């Protein structure tokens, strides 16, 4: 460094940050951005600008560059690829040295990778498509507080997806009536019920009252059914201090699981709550409220597969992932990709599912994928086929909308689930034979028969906005 001299002025980013001959290190954090440059900005300069602005660069040369080893700390744009079917944008692959980031801090990673660079004038639109976290960084993060196997052991539930229900209406119920709805659903054979993400501590139902009535309902349902039950008590709060106060009370009354809105509540709060859950033996259900603001635009924002990885690192035992078949956004190939990123120990690069890098999670536990949003009994065969056993199938209106009430809706879901699991275990093609499987099960379950009649015409056949780029070919 002593031989370097300072030359004031502005130089092209590509002179420093575009290195097509660079071979990424095993310890580098790798990112794939989809870049739409402004007119007149060529690809190499745009990619280098993103590398610079998301790492060590600024708009002009500064003399303090000479006080450190810029060649070591800088981000490097090392590859550019075409986006299938879209000539206006391109993929840029950027490598960042691991020492740019605080250990175990996904907050710090996001501050750089999706920070000010997203407002850079030379870039018309920018999207973070994927990130490869090296195992050296993964091991500094806490990850899920319990993980899939520990949760199964705690809840004594094996060999099938778990069944849940979000209590509706999402807002307006009193605590006592809310607890009644929880009891009916759990008594009807569900494993879990859930606070809607909108429920915190509003005037119509304060959090402490809700917690008490819900836990009473849970214990009563457990006593009557002989099964372990739980309700996701949402501890998301205006401040971290209040969040921990609510979490402590949930533990005090014997609740097995709490809930947090990890994007609306903040990644820092989520990581802290995950650590608290790990230390206190609590399960943590995570909702993704606000995600579509970040991930739905196919040209600007953060892809949900990145948000999935960030959640697994930050900590959560469940994460909502979409359904493929329900009312919320998410195509099948992409959804299967981020489900694997949530649950598996190693996920190889697979462009057909939108996965740009190998991802090694080492010994970090996986988390349950939660399917929720506009699902009902007719979706059960597809849900079991798509999500497999390590999932939570979270119905709302598909339970509470049953003409005979909540318990009947819950019972219909449980019968449909067990029929599909049994058929799958017998080697049947449950997606193709779903109608026959459900019809046969309904012969012994009037609750299922009525549910099938009620929702036989309900479909959500809208095209996906955020498709895999390969689908545009």
From Swiss-Prot:
EC number(s) on file: 4.1.1.39
Residues holding substrate:
116, 166, 170, 288, 320, 372
Cofactors? Mg(2+)
Does the keyword Lyase feature in the UniProt annotation? yes
Q: Where, by residue number, does Mg(2+) bind?
A: 194, 196-197
The record places the active site at 168, 287
Describe the reaction catalysed, as an equation: 2 (2R)-3-phosphoglycerate + 2 H(+) = D-ribulose 1,5-bisphosphate + CO2 + H2O; D-ribulose 1,5-bisphosphate + O2 = 2-phosphoglycolate + (2R)-3-phosphoglycerate + 2 H(+)
Cofactor: binding details:
Binds 1 Mg(2+) ion per subunit.
The alphabetized UniProt keywords are: Calvin cycle, Carbon dioxide fixation, Lyase, Magnesium, Metal-binding, Monooxygenase, Oxidoreductase
Gene3D superfamilies in the record: Ribulose bisphosphate carboxylase, large subunit, C-terminal domain, RuBisCO large subunit, N-terminal domain
Q: Which GO terms describe its biological process?
A: reductive pentose-phosphate cycle
Q: What does this protein do?
A: RuBisCO catalyzes two reactions: the carboxylation of D-ribulose 1,5-bisphosphate, the primary event in carbon dioxide fixation, as well as the oxidative fragmentation of the pentose substrate. Both reactions occur simultaneously and in competition at the same active site.
Entries under NCBIfam families matching the protein: PRK04208.1 (NF003252)
The record's family statement is: Belongs to the RuBisCO large chain family. Type I subfamily.
The name this protein carries in UniProt is: Ribulose bisphosphate carboxylase large chain
Classification from the root reads: Bacteria, Pseudomonadati, Pseudomonadota, Betaproteobacteria, Nitrosomonadales
């Amino acid at each position: 460094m002593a031989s370097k001299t300072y030359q004031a002025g502005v130089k092209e980013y590509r002179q420093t940050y575009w290195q097509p001959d660079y071979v990424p290190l095993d310890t580098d954090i790798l990112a794939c951005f989809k870049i739409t440059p402004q007119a007149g900005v060529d690809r190499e300069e745009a990619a280098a600008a993103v590398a610079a602005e998301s790492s060590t660069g600024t708009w002009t040369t500064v003399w303090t560059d000479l006080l450190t080893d810029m060649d070591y700390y800088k981000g490097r744009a090392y590859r550019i690829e075409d986006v299938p079917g879209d000539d206006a944008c391109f993929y840029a692959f950027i490598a960042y040295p691991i020492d740019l980031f605080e250990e175990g801090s996904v907050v710090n990673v996001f501050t750089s990778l999706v920070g000010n660079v997203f407002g850079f004038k030379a870039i018309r639109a920018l999207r973070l498509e994927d990130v490869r976290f090296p195992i050296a960084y993964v091991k500094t993060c806490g990850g899920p507080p319990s993980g899939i196997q520990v949760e199964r052991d705690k809840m004594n539930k094996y060999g099938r997806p778990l069944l849940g229900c979000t209590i509706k209406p999402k807002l307006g119920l009193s605590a006592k009536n809310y607890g009644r709805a929880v009891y009916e659903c759990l008594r009807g054979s569900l494993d879990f019920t859930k606070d809607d993400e909108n429920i915190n501590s509003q005037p119509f139902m304060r959090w402490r009252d809700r917690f008490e009535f819900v836990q009473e309902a849970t214990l009563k349902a457990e006593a009557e059914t002989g099964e372990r039950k739980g309700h996701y008590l949402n501890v998301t709060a205006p401040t971290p201090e209040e969040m921990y106060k609510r979490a402590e009370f949930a533990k005090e009354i014997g609740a097995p699981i709490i809930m947090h809105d990890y994007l609306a509540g903040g990644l820092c709060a989520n990581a802290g709550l995950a650590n608290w859950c790990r230390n206190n033996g609590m399960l943590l259900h995570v909702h993704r409220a606000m995600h579509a603001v970040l991930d739905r635009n196919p040209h600007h924002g953060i892809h949900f597969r990145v948000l999935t990885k960030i959640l697994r690192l930050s900590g959560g035992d469940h994460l909502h992932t979409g359904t493929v078949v329900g009312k919320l956004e998410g195509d099948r190939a992409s959804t299967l990709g981020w489900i694997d990123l949530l649950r598996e120990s190693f996920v190889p690069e697979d462009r057909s599912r939108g996965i740009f890098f190998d991802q090694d999670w080492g010994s970090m536990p996986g988390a349950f994928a939660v399917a929720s949003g506009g699902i009902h009994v007719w979706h059960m065969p597809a849900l079991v086929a798509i999500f497999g056993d390590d999932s939570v199938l979270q119905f709302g209106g598909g339970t509470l909308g049953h003409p005979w009430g909540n318990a009947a809706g819950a019972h219909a879901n449980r019968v449909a689930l067990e029929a599909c699991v049994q058929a799958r275990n017998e080697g049947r093609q449950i997606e193709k034979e779903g109608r026959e499987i459900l019809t046969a099960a309904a012969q012994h379950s009037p609750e299922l028969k009525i549910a099938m009649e009620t929702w036989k015409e309900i479909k959500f056949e809208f095209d996906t906005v955020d498709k895999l780029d390969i689908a545009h070919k």
